[in-house]
């Protein structure tokens, strides 16, 4: 199949860019962008490669994405080696095909076609690409955004190429994401022999009523844009492994995915009040990995909806479900942020794949969005 989008996707898949190793992917993209007049600024931090590229001036539409991928798992279970892209029955197989090397290829080819037709476009077209989205994300998009904000860089619209679609390209567009807050809680007791409980203080017994009340809380009811806030216990550990020792500590890790109805400070205050109510001795550590954000109907959402309707003849759902993405960092710049990408049914799985025709369609959608906002 001879198609510039498919060919570029295959070239990217062949580079085993396990996070945060870029494995040469960005050099490939940079060469293509510089060839059509983009200025490219490499913005590497620690072990992570990033770049910021732009062409033109004025209102800015940025395309954001990541070159890194998650490990393939057991390569023997793949129908073909995970870093050897293969097309079978119209499906392109390979690690990163859907998340998100196909999107990157579609973005770059769309930019090439757009610039060829609009060499003197009125707005500024930009790219923000990182090699660490799948792992810690500490030195990726967040650091680039901080650097851009420090010099008052303008960013009006941002399209993130995360695989947002469920069954067909564009059936779901993400116009926001929930916040994510993790609590690492240690309940302190006194270790001792199970036969002498009066000489010990069992933190598991102490914490049970607290945890029972915690999991029963209805944090909010959500709103028209966000589902209700959810809290899930992810890890719980206590004990020495012996059946005759009362543990001295209980560790509990729980995560909140929260809507715009709450702030992280409101959640923290309620948890701490509950700990005090149950008179627990505790140590607590919080990790806020992202605030909730929402892009209401406006020029970017309208342009994305228009592109999907034009090429796929469907009206996309605007949703804020799912995990976090790098859009949470970009939203800090005051930009309208929307995610549009391929079908996500196989992301992070063995035999990750994407419909090759979908990537061609995605490139046309991206180009139409460019034409509506910065032509």
Swiss-Prot record:
Gene Ontology BP term (one): lysine biosynthetic process via diaminopimelate
Catalytic activity: N-succinyl-(2S,6S)-2,6-diaminopimelate + H2O = (2S,6S)-2,6-diaminopimelate + succinate
Record keywords, A-Z: Amino-acid biosynthesis, Cobalt, Diaminopimelate biosynthesis, Hydrolase, Lysine biosynthesis, Metal-binding, Zinc
Binding site for Zn(2+) 2: 99, 134, 348
The keyword Iron belongs to this UniProt entry's keyword annotation: no
Active site: 68, 133 (proton acceptor)
Cystine crosslinks: none
Binding positions for Zn(2+) 1 per the UniProt entry: 66, 99, 162
Pathway(s) this gene product operates in, as recorded in its UniProt entry: Amino-acid biosynthesis; L-lysine biosynthesis via DAP pathway; LL-2,6-diaminopimelate from (S)-tetrahydrodipicolinate (succinylase route): step 3/3
Cofactor: Zn(2+); Co(2+)
Enzyme class (EC, first level): hydrolase
A GO term, aspect molecular function: acetylornithine deacetylase activity
InterPro entries (alphabetical): ArgE/DapE_CS, Bact_exopeptidase_dim_dom, DapE_proteobac, Peptidase_M20, Peptidase_M20_dimer, Peptidase_M20A
SUPFAM superfamilies, A to Z: Bacterial exopeptidase dimerisation domain (SSF55031), Zn-dependent exopeptidases (SSF53187)
Highest taxon of the lineage: Bacteria
Co-factor binding comment: Binds 2 Zn(2+) or Co(2+) ions per subunit.
PROSITE patterns: ARGE_DAPE_CPG2_1, ARGE_DAPE_CPG2_2
Protein EC: 3.5.1.18
Family: Belongs to the peptidase M20A family. DapE subfamily.
Subunit structure as annotated in this protein's UniProt entry: Homodimer.
Its job: Catalyzes the hydrolysis of N-succinyl-L,L-diaminopimelic acid (SDAP), forming succinate and LL-2,6-diaminopimelate (DAP), an intermediate involved in the bacterial biosynthesis of lysine and meso-diaminopimelic acid, an essential component of bacterial cell walls.
Protein name, UniProt field: Succinyl-diaminopimelate desuccinylase
High-level lineage: Bacteria, Pseudomonadati, Pseudomonadota, Gammaproteobacteria, Enterobacterales
The gene coding this protein: dapE
């Amino acid at each position: 199949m001879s198609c510039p989008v498919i060919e570029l996707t295959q070239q990217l898949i062949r580079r085993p860019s396990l996070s945060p190793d870029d494995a040469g992917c960005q050099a490939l993209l940079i060469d293509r962008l510089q060839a059509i007049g983009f200025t490219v600024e490499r913005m590497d931090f620690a072990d992570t490669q990033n770049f910021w590229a732009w062409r033109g001036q004025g209102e800015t539409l940025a395309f954001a994405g990541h070159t890194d991928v998650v490990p393939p798992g057991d390569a023997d279970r793949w129908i073909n080696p995970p870093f050897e892209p293969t097309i079978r029955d119209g499906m392109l197989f390979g690690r990163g095909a859907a998340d998100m090397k196909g999107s990157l290829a579609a973005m770059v080819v769309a930019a090439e076609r757009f610039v060829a037709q609009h060499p003197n476009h009125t707005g500024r077209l930009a790219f923000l690409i990182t090699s660490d989205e799948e792992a810690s994300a500490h030195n990726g998009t967040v650091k680039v955004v901080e650097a851009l904000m420090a010099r008052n860089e303008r960013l009006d619209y941002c399209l993130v190429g995360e695989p947002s679609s469920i069954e067909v390209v564009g059936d779901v567009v993400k116009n926001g994401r929930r916040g994510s807050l993790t609590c690492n809680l240690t309940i302190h007791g006194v270790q001792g022999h199970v036969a002498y409980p009066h000489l010990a203080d069992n933190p598991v017994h102490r914490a049970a009523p607290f945890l029972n009340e915690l999991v029963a809380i209805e944090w909010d009811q959500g709103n028209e844009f966000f589902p209700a806030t959810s809290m899930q216990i992810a890890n719980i550990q206590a004990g020495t492994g012996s059946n005759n020792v009362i543990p001295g500590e209980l560790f509990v890790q729980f995560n909140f995915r929260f809507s715009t109805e709450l702030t992280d400070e409101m959640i923290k205050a309620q948890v701490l009040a509950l700990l005090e109510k149950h008179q627990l001795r505790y140590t607590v550590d919080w990790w806020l990995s992202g605030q909730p954000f929402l892009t209401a109907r406006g020029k970017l959402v309208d342009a994305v909806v228009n592109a999907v309707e034009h090429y796929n003849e469907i009206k996309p759902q605007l949703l804020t479900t799912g995990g976090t993405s790098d859009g949470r960092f970009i939203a800090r710049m005051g930009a309208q942020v929307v995610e549009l990408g391929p079908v996500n049914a196989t992301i992070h799985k063995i035999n990750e794949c994407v419909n090759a025709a979908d990537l061609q369609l995605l490139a046309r959608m991206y180009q139409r969005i460019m034409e509506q906002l910065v032509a």
